[in-house]
Amino acid sequence: MAKKILVVDDEAHIRMLYAEELAEEGYEVITAEGGLNLLERIEREKPDLVVLDIKMVDYNGLDLLQDIRNKFYDLPVILCSAYDTFKDDMKSIAADHYVIKSFDLAELKTKIGELLEDPA
């Protein structure tokens, strides 16, 4: 059975890109536009890993990460941002990895592979 990844990003083209690229790697990918009902969605969908944008229009990804950690402490989370200014904060908020958003998903795929080992 394929590992399930939840991609949370407010930009539709990013969600689509990540979903297509990660599906090609053998993962089952589900997406969310933001943090509304995110904890309930995680409870229902039971993803193996979350890829979480930090800067979203209606939600702060760092706050969402804390909420995820409080309820699903062992769920791997990779933070993504177009800015590298959050890299130092990542350690203090307990994200598993931090990657800079890019159309080349090599780094993201590597980090996902490290956390999930094999895609299927």
Would you name each region that the model predicts?
Residues 15, 57:
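The feature encodes the CheY-like receiver
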Residues 16-24:
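Charged docking surfaces used in two-component/phosphorelay signaling
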Residues 26-33, 41:
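Short hydrophobic/Thr-rich beta-strand motif most characteristic of the beta2 strand and flanking loop
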Residues 33-34, 60-63:
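Acidic catalytic/metal-coordinating carboxylates
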Residues 40, 62-72:
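Short amphipathic alpha-helix used as the core "switch/output" element in two-component signaling
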Residues 53:
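Active-site residues of response regulator receiver
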Residues 103-114:
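C-terminal output helix
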